[in-house]
Amino acid sequence: PAAQDEFRVQVTATTYPVYALACAVSAGVEGVSVSRLNTGQVSCLHDYTLTVSDMARLEQADLVLINGAGLEAFLDGVLDQLDAPLGDCSVGIDLLEADGQLHSHGEDGEIGHSHDHDPHYWMDPRNAAVMADTIAQALSQADPDNAGRYQANASLAAEALTNAYAAWTTSLSGLSYPYLITFHDGFRYFAHAFDLELLFAMEEEDGATASAKDILTASNLVKQYHLPAVFMEVNGSGSAARAVAGETGSAVSTLTMLMDGADAPNEAGAVDILTQLYLSPMEQNIKTLMEVLK
């Protein structure tokens, strides 16, 4: 598009959480555009294939920001060919080990995840604050004249994230049922952040259905802990969750992994953007837990 000429710095983010934080950190800086790959429609990025428009966004970028930690397997072989510098948002994050014991994959015989670490670290707001700082550093290198603005925005974002985390921790500290059973394996950092015990996590990927054994395991845990609800991810299939609910009488509630969301509003400040794109959906998760696990 001709409009791209207006931008001095074109930033491409590979995932929605990286996009959300990059928009907040670059708020108010003229001539910076942040776009994202079209990864929002899948619950699990292992099912994702690059589109032609994605490829164009990557090739036109002056800076490419990735989640890292093994999440972007779909970019293997692509990133090396790009001219743009790469900002890896997982740098400086205390990553959890990928724990094969905790999550189970559908029975298509293929285990798609071979990460050494769990890459879903943005689900802990404290990690999102680290991401904001990493993004500010990457933007400052791409656009040194505005380094002060990026750092100031990252500081504002970190403060808002820290305050939200403190409030949410207090809200969740009194749950009668501080336990999660999730039908997506991306909630470990979230559980860890808020001192919830993730009893069982399983993921139904494209073409794979939950095994009878997994449904039985989850159902037994629901009964053992008297859980009022199990949780599916907003983009996930939900069939296994419904099977467990049918077996146990528990409810099925929905949580978001923030894989998709609204575009950043124009002319908004760092905290407003962060609130709309990250804090509000995360707050919805907190409210859901307070409603169903109280």
Residue ranges with predicted function:
Residues 1-294:
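Extracytoplasmic metal-acquisition and chelation regions
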